[in-house]
Amino acid sequence: MGLTNCCSHEELMSRLVDSVKEISGFSSSRGFIGKIQGDLVRRITLLSPFFEELIDVNVELKKDQITGFEAMRIALDSSLELFRSVNGGSKLFQLFDRDSLVEKFRDMTVEIEAALSQIPYEKIEVSEEVREQVQLLHFQFKRAKERWEESDLQLSHDLAMAENVMDPDPIILKRLSQELQLTTIDELKKESHAIHEYFLSYDGDPDDCFERMSSLLKNLVDFVTMESSDPDPSTGSRIVSRHRSPVIPEYFRCPISLELMKDPVIVSTGQTYERSSIQKWLDAGHKTCPKSQETLLHAGLTPNYVLKSLIALWCESNGIELPQNQGSCRTTKIGGSSSSDCDRTFVLSLLEKLANGTTEQQRAAAGELRLLAKRNVDNRVCIAEAGAIPLLVELLSSPDPRTQEHSVTALLNLSINEGNKGAIVDAGAITDIVEVLKNGSMEARENAAATLFSLSVIDENKVAIGAAGAIQALISLLEEGTRRGKKDAATAIFNLCIYQGNKSRAVKGGIVDPLTRLLKDAGGGMVDEALAILAILSTNQEGKTAIAEAESIPVLVEIIRTGSPRNRENAAAILWYLCIGNIERLNVAREVGADVALKELTENGTDRAKRKAASLLELIQQTEGVAVTTVP
């Protein structure tokens, strides 16, 4: 499938230069992934002279030559996304997910090598020195994708020992802390915040991985704390120290009370405090962070579940009774067992703030309910039974964007529970959610789309959501959103279009053109979703006509030729619906090589794809030489 030109020749080269420049800034080592990342960054950086010379000498490129550079743009954009994710994320999560991460780096190497293969650098007028450098780099990329490094066996062994041994050897913990570059309390604090962010952004159920990360982080905190308190400890002194009363790690103490935290919360500056201590500080009228003295942007308090879990693990391993706090929803998973005691009194106090609080209090309470509802099933039931849903629905109309965002996301998390879906709809939420989808912040729009998808699982809700104007708003998000937003919109649209009436709404709303554009953008990551929606729309007469008028047949044939098994099946099904009873479209399909692609599909496709391909081939053969008569 061909790539569409994203911009002019000069703009394209400038983008490539800018991408390489940004990528070159990621060259510093990042623990166990450092060498793999460093090698890829170094090779990409060496491409810069090639792109810069093409700008300087203003070489005119032919259309077929530009294709390779556009493929390179897509590859470098994907590489940038990977580098940002790796360098800003949790090191422990990357350690546990290292095989997948290494595979992603390998995929990037393969993608860049494929792009270089499409660039005819031997025929482009650049200096001999630059041409030879590109040729050498191309060879290096080819060799790199064929000779990929295996996993670090020492690292795997150390991780297994640290996870499965009750009292890990300090030598192993030292190796791990050095490998992960978590050798100081400050670095461990940053890692704790990174795990916290990972937990908040994770779409699925993170508990198992979260528990493993928390347990290992706790061991590293113990080790680094012991190391820093005794710069040169002998083996004997370490053994003795383990029989003394455990020293509470500084990071577990509240900066205000200096006591072990029971209910750690994060303020807007990023500092963590014991809830009761910081609440007293705020109630006294203070507007600054006690530790940093920075002005607080708001009075909201976000539970630090990562730190709370670490404190629980530390108390358990040191034989200390776990501190109990009053008035909070507690969900703690220790040693593989999960306990959840959602404190109704605490939830009711949050609902009081939703109903009668200031804007800041409403924002903070909605944010806390959002997190609690995400945590587990029991919390979702507790929050709904306490009467939160109507109050959250009311706040969907809040003029404060952050409150609106928290409210729609809290409803999304509550809707995961099947029993809550009906309560959300009964509270009149659909119209307000659609309004957020139209006019909210980008994150609020994305979560509104996800909420509508969740609610649309119930068939009668599909009708109500479509009637409320959601389809047009979802199409806008499909065109304007981030990659995640596009996927949320596409998933919701697909589910809604199972209802026949919503197919017409989607077609009249102009969905076919953006879907066709997504089909043509191989690097956009939305081909699967676009095909799935088109497949369901092609069973509708209006949809069939609109898809054909969008000149989609050549694109569909290309997907049948080169796509994944599932995409080839969907493309064949769409083409079958378009061509049945329409000789003109059959002729177009034949002209772009459909017969060859379909013949191959009858041999190597899925069962459904084989049936559609065989039927289409028969139609094409029957209509050869027949005069064109159009049937809509």
Curated annotation (Swiss-Prot):
The U-box N-terminal domain (UND) is not required for in vitro ubiquitination activity. Gene3D superfamilies: Leucine-rich Repeat Variant (1.25.10.10), Zinc/RING finger domain, C3HC4 (zinc finger) (3.30.40.10). The record marks I256, W281, P290 as: Putative E2 binding site. Expressed in flowers, green siliques, seeds and rosette leaves. Functions as an E3 ubiquitin ligase with specific E2 ubiquitin-conjugating enzymes. Undergoes auto-ubiquitination. The keyword Cytoplasm does not apply. Residues 247-321 form the U-box domain. Keywords: Repeat, Transferase, Ubl conjugation pathway. InterPro entries: ARM-like, ARM-type_fold, Armadillo, RING-Ubox_PUB, Ubox_domain, Znf_RING/FYVE/PHD. Its EC number is 2.3.2.27. Pathway: Protein modification; protein ubiquitination. GO terms for molecular function: transmembrane receptor protein serine/threonine kinase binding; ubiquitin-protein transferase activity. Homodimer. Interacts with SNL1. Binds to SD11, SD16, SD17, SD18, SD113, SD129 and SD25. One of its GO terms (biological process) is protein ubiquitination. This is U-box domain-containing protein 14. It catalyses: S-ubiquitinyl-[E2 ubiquitin-conjugating enzyme]-L-cysteine + [acceptor protein]-L-lysine = [E2 ubiquitin-conjugating enzyme]-L-cysteine + N(6)-ubiquitinyl-[acceptor protein]-L-lysine. CDD domains: RING-Ubox_PUB (cd16664). ARM repeats lie at residues 377-416, 418-457, 459-498, 500-539, 541-580. It is an enzyme of class 2 (transferase). SUPFAM superfamilies: ARM repeat, RING/U-box. The keyword Transferase applies. It comes from the Eukaryota. It holds the Pfam family Arm.
